[in-house]
């Protein structure tokens, strides 16, 4: 395919390469607590996500953004970038520049079981996992009394109900709170394994 291309064989990758090479870069960026990611149009070569960079543009990640919020921001940026790409193509200016291997990071594909919550983590880290795995992804989940629970909307809190145990939901002031390794997670929307919302 690469050899048969008339002009160039390119890919649109949802990160600022060479960081976040690999699959699911938007999810990983949110999980890692990044405040921005980006979009890269780059050449395809024999190595995964390592071709010359033609164009890049930054995408902001707000603290309350979930993965679909960031996806739509990135999609808008792609549409804007394509004008510049086609302009470069018309001028025969698609060589781009080499990626810096010293800055490269790679992340593996994610699978549903990766969404299991470790309540020993900080509330902030768990919050990042929740917002990185919202619909249409499988979701961040935990088991309570042998039943699978999916967290759809949550936020970290410094304070919560006294006497709470790590990983055990407590109904407090109109919401479920779960004590974590550092702080509390306040759950605003919770579903069971059948995706039925659990009301407070």
Question: Language-model segments: which ranges?
Answer:
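An anion-binding loop in the catalytic cleft
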Residues: 120-200
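Acyl-group handling in specialized metabolite and lipid biosynthesis
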Residues: 109-121
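Short secondary-structure boundary/capping segments
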Residues: 1-2, 45, 107-109, 141, ...
């Amino acid at each position: 395919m690469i050899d048969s291309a008339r002009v160039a064989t390119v890919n649109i990758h949802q990160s600022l390469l060479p960081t976040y090479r690999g699959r699911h870069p938007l999810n990983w960026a949110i999980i890692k607590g990044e405040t921005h990611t980006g979009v890269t149009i780059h050449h395809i070569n024999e190595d995964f996500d390592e071709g010359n960079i033609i164009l890049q543009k930054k995408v902001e990640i707000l603290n309350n953004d979930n993965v679909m919020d960031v996806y739509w921001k990135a999609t808008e940026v792609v549409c804007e970038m394509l004008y510049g790409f086609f302009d470069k193509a018309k001028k025969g200016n698609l060589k781009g520049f080499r990626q810096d291997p010293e800055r490269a990071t790679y992340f593996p594909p994610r699978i549903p079981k990766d969404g299991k919550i470790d309540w020993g983590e900080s509330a902030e880290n768990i919050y990042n996992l929740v917002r990185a795995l919202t619909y249409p992804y499988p979701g961040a989940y935990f088991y309570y009394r042998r039943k699978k629970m999916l967290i759809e909307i949550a936020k970290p809190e410094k304070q919560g109900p006294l006497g709470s145990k790590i990983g055990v939901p407590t109904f407090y002031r109109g919401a479920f709170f779960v004590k974590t390794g550092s702080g509390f997670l306040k759950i605003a929307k919770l579903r069971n394994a059948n995706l039925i919302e659990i009301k407070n």
